Regions:
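Alpha-helical bundle segments that constitute or directly flank the non-heme di-iron/ferroxidase center
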Residues: 1-28, 51, 55-58, 62, ...
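Small-residue-biased structural context
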Residues: 2-4, 11, 24-25, 83-89, ...
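Glutamate identity and glutamate-enriched acidic tracts
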Residues: 4, 11, 18, 28, ...
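Acidic/histidine-rich alpha-helical segments that form the ligand environment
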Residues: 10-22, 80-119, 135, 140
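A short secondary-structure junction motif
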Residues: 22, 26-29, 67, 111-114, ...
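Helix N-cap and loop-to-helix transition residues
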Residues: 27, 41, 75, 88-89, ...
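Short, contiguous alpha-helical
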Residues: 32-77, 105, 118-159
Length: 159
């Protein structure tokens, strides 16, 4: 429903604040903790969130501005292991802060023209699946929450 989507957009809008509440408590020695053996470190998760949500923003722009376009896939594990994954988390957090402000405003504007915007799609070339703007909103609202829970779990498990 439109009400559910509005709530998901609010989740996207407020995600950086929720993330800040958690990462502001992290000690320097905890940034390399992981929620499971072989999983990404907290630092990698924060960088992944910036990478992933930048891609989501671009995908949102493609859906809104183009007809019949494709998602540009990327290897999230390769990105999470790239050189910038060792950089300080602050840069990625600042990206998320600005990005989510702009992204949520774009999504809120899209909801005003819901009948036309929410049904527009992108094609995912690997699966052939059509992904709508509604799908993206739902996916990325839960994506942030999912990784926030991983960070919390890593911190709890380390104590």
């Amino acid at each position: 429903s439109l009400g559910e989507l509005f709530n998901h957009v609010l989740e996207i809008q407020h995600f950086p604040t929720e993330l800040a509440k958690v990462i502001s408590t992290i000690q320097e020695s905890q940034w390399d903790l992981s929620y499971r053996d072989g999983g990404w470190s907290i630092k990698q998760i924060v960088h992944h969130l910036a990478d992933s949500h930048m891609n989501a923003y671009v995908r949102t722009k493609h859906i809104i501005t183009q007809d019949q376009t494709q998602i540009q896939p990327y290897d999230e594990n390769a990105w999470a292991s790239s050189l910038d994954a060792d950089f300080h988390h602050e840069a990625s957090y600042l990206i998320l802060l600005g990005l989510h402000q702009k992204w949520s405003l774009l999504l809120l504007e899209s909801l005003k023209d819901a009948a036309n915007q929410l049904v527009k799609t992108l094609e995912h070339p690997e699966s052939g699946r059509q992904v709508s703007l509604s799908d993206l909103i739902r996916l990325y609202a839960s994506h942030g929450t999912h990784h926030l829970e991983q960070i919390k779990y890593a911190l709890i498990a380390s104590n």
